[in-house]
Amino acid sequence: MEQYKYDFIEFALSRNVLKFGEFTLKSGRISPYFFNAGLFNTGRDLAKLGEYYATAIQASQIEYDVLFGPAYKGIPIATTVAVALANQFAIDKPCCFNRKEAKTHGEGGQLIGAVLEGKILLVDDVITAGTAIRESMQLIKLNQASLAGVMIALNRQEKGNGELSAIQEVERDYACQVHSIINFDDLVYFIEQSAKHAPYLTKMREYRAKYGV
């Protein structure tokens, strides 16, 4: 596992963004871990989060023209990623995000920031049902742009209602790749190397056996 992935897991644990234990998800599943990126909520944490996204984007070698953050969680992510790319890698990419409802006065429209054109890299925290991606695709197509790829913080690597995960469905439906800073397998590997978190290993493996893709 790359060092930045290990460091990101440590960072998420230190901010209680990532927790191991027993958690009931909206789906009703009992999960041995919980991830809430909304708890990256200070200037320092958001700056660091952007750096991890930027590192993962560079590692993925995605070719893109514009960063797009779907409302609402994707907005601060796209912003901090754009800053991190400029500061860390001297890559100055335009950044765009959407409103949930189109504005009829002022600058108007549904988009804020750069023009949504060319190859779009969508950034978000996680993909649960893929709803934000599908809504974003309507905007991307409306602007004659194309989806170059998606970068999220965590790929849960678990089935939805069918045999595929929401991420696999997005990849199938839009012929794009979904990348992540870390995935479920990385969490398992991290626990395998950590005596402190060893008690959670069995539950994590059981969860993967039951719901993994």
Curated annotation (Swiss-Prot):
Cellular component annotations (GO), alphabetically ordered: cytoplasm
Subunit annotation: Homodimer.
GO biological process: 'de novo' pyrimidine nucleobase biosynthetic process; 'de novo' UMP biosynthetic process; pyrimidine ribonucleoside biosynthetic process
Keywords linked to the UniProt accession: Glycosyltransferase, Magnesium, Pyrimidine biosynthesis, Transferase
Presence of keyword Oxidoreductase: no
Species the sequence originates in: Haemophilus ducreyi (strain 35000HP / ATCC 700724)
Binding site for orotate: 34-35, 128, 156
GO terms of molecular function: magnesium ion binding; orotate phosphoribosyltransferase activity
Cofactor: Mg(2+)
Keyword Glycosyltransferase listed: yes
Role: Catalyzes the transfer of a ribosyl phosphate group from 5-phosphoribose 1-diphosphate to orotate, leading to the formation of orotidine monophosphate (OMP).
Pathway connected to this protein: Pyrimidine metabolism; UMP biosynthesis via de novo pathway; UMP from orotate: step 1/2
Binding residues annotated for 5-phospho-alpha-D-ribose 1-diphosphate, in chain numbering: 26, 72-73, 99-100, 103, 105, 124-132
Highest taxon of source: Bacteria
Classification via Gene3D superfamilies: 3.40.50.2020
Family stated for the protein in its record: Belongs to the purine/pyrimidine phosphoribosyltransferase family. PyrE subfamily.
Catalytic activity annotation: orotidine 5'-phosphate + diphosphate = orotate + 5-phospho-alpha-D-ribose 1-diphosphate
InterPro entries hit by this protein: OPRT, Or_phspho_trans_dom, PRibTrfase_dom, PRTase-like
Protein name: Orotate phosphoribosyltransferase
First-level EC class: transferase
EC numbers: 2.4.2.10
SUPFAM superfamilies recorded: PRTase-like
